[in-house]
């Protein structure tokens, strides 16, 4: 579960390395899970890349440490909290996605992120 002021690692090559959640998008939502869109501030970034430190960006959560239950009865969790930076059209800013992503992204119409990911769990 991601909430305000949570830190996430960035799982793409947009230039940001760590982001901090400012707001979970939705009507009066407190927590974000896999597939939810958040507004975040870039806290650590690589030089001469697409995003800079202190930029405000939108990102979609692709991995969480919190255990997630699926409708089939399986439960899944990851080793870190990670997000992919997106633009207003829900397309990723980077051209690569690092690490596994959850299958729930396909159901939320983030098919471009799923196709770039090396592994879908």
UniProtKB/Swiss-Prot annotation:
HAMAP family: Ribosomal_uL14. The keyword Transmembrane does not apply. Belongs to the universal ribosomal protein uL14 family. NCBIfam families: rplN_bact. GO terms for cellular component: cytosolic large ribosomal subunit. The keyword Cytoplasm does not apply. Part of the 50S ribosomal subunit. Forms a cluster with proteins L3 and L19. In the 70S ribosome, L14 and L19 interact and together make contacts with the 16S rRNA in bridges B5 and B8. SMART domains: Ribosomal_L14. GO terms for molecular function: large ribosomal subunit rRNA binding; structural constituent of ribosome. One of its GO terms (biological process) is translation. This is Large ribosomal subunit protein uL14. Keywords: Ribonucleoprotein, Ribosomal protein, RNA-binding, rRNA-binding. Binds to 23S rRNA. Forms part of two intersubunit bridges in the 70S ribosome. InterPro entries: Ribosomal_uL14 (IPR000218), Ribosomal_uL14_bac-type (IPR005745), Ribosomal_uL14_sf (IPR036853). The gene is rplN.
